[in-house]
Amino acid sequence: MIHVKDHKQYDMFNPFEHLGPKRLALLESSWAHLFREEILHKLPAEKLFHLYDEFKGRKTKELYAMLGLVIIQQMEDCTDQDAIDNFALNIKWQYALNITETSDVASYVSPRTLWNMRDIVARQGLQDTIFENVTAALSKLCTLDPSKQRLDSVHIFSNMAHLGRIRLFVRTIRTFLTNLKRHHGKDYDNLGEMVLRYDKKSDGAFAVKPTESAKKLVELGDDCFYLVERFKEHEAITRMDSYKHLVRLFAEQCIVEKGENNTSKVAIKASKDISSDSLQNPSDPGAGYCGHKGKGYQMQVMETYSKDKTQPNLITHIKVEPANQSDANALIPAIEDAQSKELAPTELLADTLYGSDSNIEQAKELGVTVIAPVEIAMASSLVFQSRDSVFPGALCALSVQRVLRKPDPS
């Protein structure tokens, strides 16, 4: 049964009055007061209503407080157990979440409840709505000037094992076989000796010397191809995510060649031919690969800035994407997203990759001036034909030359 409070309605008596004026003053000058007064009631608890019955069953935990708990845990960088302890015992957290009752029902949350709520937020895609609501509330509260902003990306390492090609094949095939055994036991049993090869007890068979890795990869490619072909007509199995990962792995890592007597022969692609958006780990199929930063994701972040140090900076745009995505493709979507929130800049600082000619022209059409360094190769190719002539890009070239010039030893 749905349980929510109206957090915009004040209590007749202050439930925290017992703390005394000095401790109350500390609370009211902390982040907890800002969260309680400006953010808590803006959280999208109504988007959870369809998951619960309005009248039947046991009451849920207070849904605004649960969403707030998920946010504050990330904000304070707490472990699950620390978050649970703070929810139950920390006055500042209880004040921020407007927990005014002292019963275990109101002031305690189990690990499973916290896990489920975090999973719901991710599966329902509520993070975008939460960000938009909080950003709108803070921008109005702080009356910030969004005209000057900066954009950059930060790499995020996924919480997954970094697998070489052999381990990637083994992990993907083993994951498929595990799910096949769980849901289609007869089909699993009919595979015979293959299932024994991919038992965890047989891991030593895949620890090969570097000189033997090419041969082992071909064997793994053959097994992958065999499983893909064997079950491609089985509708229920082809709907399994682990089977889709198997198909994706084979398409990205292998090619099928025609052998003797018109038979199919599996060949392994060269490493240089593997796309950066290929499967990195079946446990996290959305992760990508960046040759500069590694495996995982990257986050595009755009925020306001001001020469006035008393003005806070506000993040106006966030987008998480696979690590293989280029920064060059992120500029225009970031500007358009900020415009949809009425927080668009007029001047935007960005790194070199964002500052392509195409991006600068498109941004100009959107009313935004992009300031970005010129690539070194481009700067070095600019040649002045005379001291009096100035052509497009000259000023940028001069600024780059000033940046690149070595400091005078004197």
Regions found by a protein language model. Give the residues of each.
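Short, positively charged loop/turn segments that connect secondary-structure elements
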Residues: 92-113
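Alpha-helical support elements that line or immediately flank enzyme active sites
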Residues: 67-77
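Basic polycationic patches enriched in arginine
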Residues: 387, 402-405
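Basic, short loop/linker segments at the boundary and entry of helix-turn-helix/winged-helix-like folds
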Residues: 28-68
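Charged, often Cys/His-bearing segments associated with DNA-binding zinc-finger transcription factors
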Residues: 1-39
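Helix-centered, glycine/charged polyanion-binding patches within enzymatic domains
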Residues: 361-390, 410
